[in-house]
Amino acid sequence: VFLLSEKPAASQHTRIYNNKNHYSSLVAKRTMPLTVTENVRKIVLENGLTVLTKEVHTAPVVTVQVWYKVGSRNEEPGANGIAHQLEHMMFKGTKNRPIQFGRLFSALGSDSNAFTSYDQTAYYGTVERDKLKALLVLEADRMQNSLINAEQLASEKRVVISELQGYENSPEYRLNRAVMQAAFPNHAYGLPVGGTKADVDRFQVEQVRNYYQNFYNPDNAVLVVVGDFKTANVLEIVKDVFGKLLNSQQSTVNSQRLTVNSQRLTVNRQQSIASTPIVLREPGAGQLLQVVYPLPDVNQPDVPALDVMDYILTEGRNSRLYQALVESGLANEVTAGVTSLRESGWYELLVTAAPSQKLKKIDSALSRAIANVVEKGIKAEEVKRAKTQLTADVILSNRDITSQAMQLGNDETTADDYRYTDRYLAAVSQVKEADVVAVIKKYLKKEARTVGFFEPTQKQFKEISDKPQSAQTTENFSLSTPELSSEVVKYLPPVAATDTITRVLPQQFTFANGLRVLLLPDKSTPTVTLSGYIEAGMEFDPADKAGLAAVVADNLMNGTKAKDILAIAKALEERGASLDFEAYREGVRIEGDSLAEDLPILLEILADVVRNSTFPVKELELNRQQTLTTLQLELDDPSEVAKRTFVQSIYPKKHPLHTFPTQESLEHISRKDVIDFKAKHYRPDTLVIALVGDFDLDKVRSLLQTKFGDWQVIGQPPKLKYPTVSLPEKIVHVNPVLPGKAQAITYMGYTGINRQDSRFHAALVLNQILGGDTLSSRLGAEVRDRQGLSYGIYSYFQAGKKVGTFLIEMQTSPEDTGKAIASTHQLLQQIHQQGVTAPEVETAKHTLISNYNVSLANPEELTDRILMNEVYELDTVELRSFTQKIQQVTLAQVNQAARELLHPDKIVVVTAGPAVLAEQRIK
């Protein structure tokens, strides 16, 4: 999937342990729902537009999505990436609204984006319910009236090439591209979804415009609307807004070509046997093994059994391939997935090798493990566990309305039936052991697979830095005049009066031992979301044992006094719940979720591992090797190297935040170090737990008291006081060079503010104007949209319990890096000296408030917000008063923040990736 823009991803989850105790104590035991389409209504307008609506009244928000039945599957050789290019062009304005649509979406406070995949291209936005009609009007406008001109295409082609070069930085991407082309040499499924630089360079405006007219028509689209509305009212609006649209005369010409593609695919499946592995010897860090097996299309009856097979093979620590490859020490990680599409599918396995292991040996072990399933069969409990995990994953992934709409849109465009997931879940429930063995025999044949090896030739990165320099640009890049907010207002569809939202506040409890708990019952779905925080982050790492805090967090689930690692994992996987610990600079974050009936088990495991973890030697050493491999991979990743170098350039050597793990520091960490750190920092008075979901408040409080109330420790928890850090006197450039990288990652910034700073809310408004959105901000409009220099550029105030950083992050082609940095620096100077405008402030405030309200409709984001408000020692009513504080920010306060918090001539500039020529730097 290729997004229009992308922000850093969230952490992964680890599967956790369950048992059958305590069900009746919190909720009545319920039958797991096997439908995601209840209350869905489908109509087809006279012009052929398919409309799906679903009322969900859990929060005053709605999502609008338009799915076009066109993706990379529809591309011919030489035009690879045109669907993705068109996706980008759809934000460049229409005949009626010649303005960047990102600015309109931002003004609505919409969480909007788009993506291109194999079978479809989708555009989606989630807003407060009073903005529903405005979103519908904008989507209808760009369905038929998009401006696609030569000047805009030239600029956006540079953005797309920047995006593609960013993917080229990843060895996984390069290996996958080679393997897929070999597996599907005669079908568009074998081409990269985003295209290639060579093809994108050749796109002509008429070519893209014809593609738009051909495929972007009502009879080739699905409109999905989910959220807080009345169906009859919405359908009237939809008929009025979309019913008048006409289909292009070109809209049906591609049906014959798609049939030809399908025939070619059938031939290819019998001819694309790779007898020897594809071997890539290129710059990189870790060794990789990828295997692809062809599979049937989404509507074939074997698909449910194939997904159950995948869970048995790779999901969790008890899975067959985890045991054969990771637990044995051959591999650092194994991931896999079944892809089921309109015309075909595939099963893809990706293995990251452990240090010094041979890929051929790993491949042999992989083949043996799969053959062993066929020869010896599988157990009924494995199938039962996989089916439970799979079904729970579907339910847990559909807690928010955006995800529910995504499920409907994907099913309707891929399987031609929005009810597909219901049928699929029913079929999954019927899968037996024999069915799983049968699909392995049928599809995972050694002669049918395509294999790829990635063998790295990487050398360690080297760092090029220079002395601080004076702050003048090498060229005077002229900045465009920002589009006036009056222009946004001119083209924005009418919006109804904004609703007043009254938020229910969580109940807060502090136990006698200092444990803080926040509980918010929410019966909208039969699920529970857990977030937690322990004051045991990487800031406490000893300088010579950097990485210790993360090692402790990573090993908590590896055994307790009562249960070993496999017993924990097995019991967890039986319920499809999740629990994950991840160390950050400030604190260890805990994330978990489960079906409501399994909350007692989730809390039982949480209590057991934070209180009774034993850190077995075998698992500790295996984790050390995995961590060393991960470090090796991170030092080949421009984003990770840029972040590490940026932080170490800001904070002096003796500062707690300067320390990062190295091979030497990780090798020096002993089991005693781990046990001592855990005993010192993991305490009830350093722990905060937040729960949101379907539970009885009093019973959960009682259960928490039972599990945690007798946890006693002595003394006071450790505290850190950071030394004061001065800004650099002048601009500092650092350029860590990584061989073989196509795209540069740049961080620009310095120390900033903490969450308690009185300027915090003004800083948020300032940041929204500066770089809060890659399409609508000053930086986005100038560097990305007008000049086409970056796929994505953002700014942040990272304000924590202690002073964090202000940073600007961008991705650029090496030849554009200097110009992008100089334009960014000049824009910082402009805002620092001249300030921003009153209309910009009002628009930014409205955007922040709307985004906040939309985000809290997602249970995970709501739980995290409740948790962190407590961690930052904010009043409980902050959940409700945040929007009022944003609304009260004035223009004078924002411009004062610009003068006090923007320091364009005292900035650290780190660019990781290809070498940046000295003459490109700010001087």
What is each residue range found by the language model?
Residues 304-307, 326, 761-764:
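PPIase-associated folding chaperone regions across multiple families
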Residues 82-90, 309, 551-552, 766:
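Active-site His/Glu-centered metal-binding helix of metallohydrolases
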Residues 11, 16, 22-52, 230-254, ...:
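Proteolytic maturation boundary segments
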Residues 59-72, 81-85, 99-142, 174-198, ...:
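M16 family metallopeptidases and their MPP-like homologs
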